[in-house]
Amino acid sequence: MALAYENLKLHITPEKFYVEACDPGVEDVLTIDRVSTEVTLSGKKDIPPSAITRAIYGILGTIRLVAGMYLIVITRRKKVGDLLNHSIWKATDFDIISYKKTMLHLTDSQLQDNKAFLGMLSHVLSVDGFYFSVSYDLTHTLQRLANTSPEFQEMSLLERADQRFVWNGNLLREFSAQPEIQKFAIPVVHGFIAIHSCSINGKYFDWILISRRSCFRAGVRYYVRGIDSEGHAANFVETEQIVHYNGNKASFVQTRGSIPFYWSQRPNLKYKPKPQISKAVNHMDGFQRHFDSQVISYGKQVVLNLVNQKGSEKPLEQEFSQMVSGLGNGMVRYIAFDFHKECSRMRWDRLQILVEQVAETQDEFGYFLVDTEGKVVSQQDGIFRSNCMDCLDRTNVVQSLLARRSLQYQLQRLGVLHVGQRIEEQIQFEKIYKNAWADNANACAKQYAGTGALKTDFTRTGKRTQWGLLMDGWNSLIRYYKNNFSDGFRQDSIDLFLGNYSVEEAYSTSPLHIQTDWKFLALPIIMVVAFSMCIICLLMAGDTWTETLAYVLFWGTASIGTGAIIMYNGKDFVDAPKLVQKEKMD
């Protein structure tokens, strides 16, 4: 396998960037012309002694903004652990470096826009969860890697990567077109990775959890739901659990993704906006594309739909059920499980009903296993595709239970667990397992919803607690604020980073400056003034109680009435995306 370079130095001169490969026996230098933007391969002798030098740990890629081209590099990394003897790193800090030496060629308006775009890139890079390896392909599962050709093994990491999970694919377009420079390009995945060295019965093994977020139809909670015309589902995540013991490798894969037809749930200041199923499109085309690709990638599908079967979520459950029936594909099976109803009043033990319901199917699907000689002993023949509304909190709880059941059989088969022993009884490992799955939930939730996950007290401890309920309430409030007042910026940031929106070289019309309606400023001011006057009238009573009551009723009515008008026009007051708004209106 062609590896990427691990040790790099960035040399900066006014005319060029030189990225020097410092691996033993390597003379390659990547040269980027800051004026022509040409990228070429040269030698170490071409690096001027006057260049400013710094260590970097990878090139994330290049992107065009208003000021011109920018180079994005990884400046800090943290080792997560070793996966099958390959070092896995988390990128923890980045630098965005302009090709241009000055900004004198920009107008004030362009400077402002360029600063805004830089802020968007910085925001995406500040979200925790970017991982890479220079010697292991993190974009593929063990099973996919085992079923590849010798030609595939000789490809560079960038060339062979599963493009669904390469978050810097857009930034590396120039590298993709030039095979000779691909060793300088590192595919970066976004999601979560935990690697733990564990011991049960004196037997040491590595336990790994990997969640890969798809960069297709990526975005934030309320602005990206359902699927696009290609069948890509919002918040699609592939989660792989790996065991490495004495040369044996086992893995179990699950997926999650938004309900795969055309629906939306735009923020409108209400705590829980009502989901809307589109009536203007043919749902079956995209629905079929989605499951066709899933069957090709993973085999049989068991859909676990965990949404409520009453209230605003009910139409989505009914539509999903009807769509699967209409699909008529024997490879896709549908199971609805009303998570909140079944587990109401803290009866979380009732999740075992679902686990037992799918137990026979899970045994039939099996798991992937390779022995010490590299021989494939068993394949995973199907997958559980779980979803709730957000594919976060409820989904993660169910996935952790199914993964534990698979792990039980894997460890028994490998001889780590004795006959009759259960994972739940291994206190030290159980703590590692629960915390890793809770951390996985938090990572996926922060990346999609902007806060940590709900219900993680159950994942960490196996039971629901009062403190957990309190923290869920706090996280729900933070989600409400972010979903209504900052998610437009977050969505724009992701669209810019992934290339869904591109800044043209001849940048003229700004998409960022949208004329604000008068009511956007006037109504909140009127409401605040009216509410303040109501409080003042209560605190500073008039000569008679009737006079005080009249003032309080007047200002109170004005405050409530203005608030009602704001709520009625809620969509006008939320922070909406500006860059790719139309495409998000499926």
Curated annotation (Swiss-Prot):
Membrane-related topology note: Multi-pass membrane protein
InterPro entries: SAC_dom
PROSITE patterns documented for this protein: SAC (PS50275)
The keyword Transmembrane helix appears for this protein: yes
One GO cellular component, as annotated: endoplasmic reticulum membrane
GO BP annotations listed: phosphatidylinositol dephosphorylation
Catalytic activity: a 1,2-diacyl-sn-glycero-3-phospho-(1D-myo-inositol-3-phosphate) + H2O = a 1,2-diacyl-sn-glycero-3-phospho-(1D-myo-inositol) + phosphate; a 1,2-diacyl-sn-glycero-3-phospho-(1D-myo-inositol 4-phosphate) + H2O = a 1,2-diacyl-sn-glycero-3-phospho-(1D-myo-inositol) + phosphate
Sequence ranges on the Cytoplasmic membrane side: 1-519, 569-586
Subcellular location: Endoplasmic reticulum membrane; Golgi apparatus membrane
Regions crossing the membrane: 520-540, 548-568
Tree of life domain: Eukaryota
Domain SAC: 121-450
PANTHER family in UniProt: PHOSPHATIDYLINOSITIDE PHOSPHATASE SAC1, PHOSPHATIDYLINOSITOL-3-PHOSPHATASE SAC1
Protein task: Phosphoinositide phosphatase which catalyzes the hydrolysis of phosphatidylinositol 4-phosphate (PtdIns(4)P), phosphatidylinositol 3-phosphate (PtdIns(3)P) and has low activity towards phosphatidylinositol-3,5-bisphosphate (PtdIns(3,5)P2).
Protein name: Phosphatidylinositol-3-phosphatase SAC1
Organism annotation: Xenopus laevis
